[in-house]
Regions:
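Macrodomain-like recognition of ADP-ribose-binding/processing modules
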Residues: 1-246
């Protein structure tokens, strides 16, 4: 489905060329990732067992997500829109998600028919305006020359909660649980969490930061070797550091 976002025409032209070139030159890689990608539903069990405990290093970087993807088999968070694959990448809309799409086969994977029917279309039809807790996990997405597992998830619409912070915080925590569980289940010990300017969704940075802090210091403590928050927006970056007392 086409979005109504107004994108940059030059970027759109480059995006279309990049996507088509991937379709010609990376057929096997795209097919593998599509066939092995999975939608994790909101009612799935998220219990975890720590088989190889780590002394987790948590890092905060005031940058976009791409420069922080350096380790093989990294898990990468793609905070996305649930209604338009690639956040209207082909329409020229520039975002953190489009940066990932412009440097990998991610758009070619997310635009597959299986995800349109299982994921995006149901949200366009308003089946769940709050987007539930579904995420898409896509393996073997090469970014910066290393293979990664990408978790595509969206944040809830703040307006759905009518200013009730307690309800929003509960939902944010559920979403964070699903994201971290998916990385743990797929054996990613190094994860890069790209966090954009949360003011776009009227979400208080402190609330999302607290949600990650609660889980990384309890349920997912020692599950990961490194957790890197890539946060280009300065106010959000500051709030995340405060939540972790760094």
């Amino acid at each position: 489905m086409k979005s109504n976002l107004k994108g940059d025409k030059q970027f759109a032209s480059k995006a279309i060329s990049y996507m088509m070139n991937n379709e010609r030159t990376k057929i096997k890689e795209i097919s593998y990732s599509i066939n092995n990608s999975q939608v994790y539903r909101k009612n799935a069990n998220t219990s975890v067992v720590c088989l190889h405990p780590y002394s987790t290093e948590i890092k905060f970087m005031n940058s976009g997500v791409l420069p922080q993807i350096t380790k093989p088999n990294s898990g990468v968070l793609n905070i996305a829109t649930y209604k338009f694959e690639g956040n209207d990448f082909l329409g020229g809309f520039i975002s953190e998600e489009s940066d990932l799409c412009f440097n990998s086969i991610l758009y070619n994977v997310l635009s597959a028919d299986k995800f349109k029917s299982e994921f995006y279309n149901m949200h366009c039809k308003g089946v769940d305006d709050n987007f539930g807790n579904e995420v898409i996990y896509s393996p073997k997405i090469e970014i910066n020359g290393v293979e990664c597992g990408v978790v595509t998830s969206a944040l809830p619409y703040c307006s759905m909660f009518g200013g009730k912070d307690a309800n929003l915080l509960f939902t944010l925590r559920e979403r964070v649980d699903r994201i971290l569980f998916t990385f743990a289940l797929n054996c990613h010990k190094d994860i890069v969490l790209g966090i954009y300017d949360l003011s776009l969704d009227n979400i208080k940075p402190s609330m999302l930061a607290e949600s990650f802090s609660v889980y990384l210091n309890d349920k997912y403590k020692n599950i990961f070797e490194t957790v890197t928050f890539a946060i280009p927006e300065s106010k959000t970056y500051k709030k995340f550091k405060e939540a972790f007392n760094t």
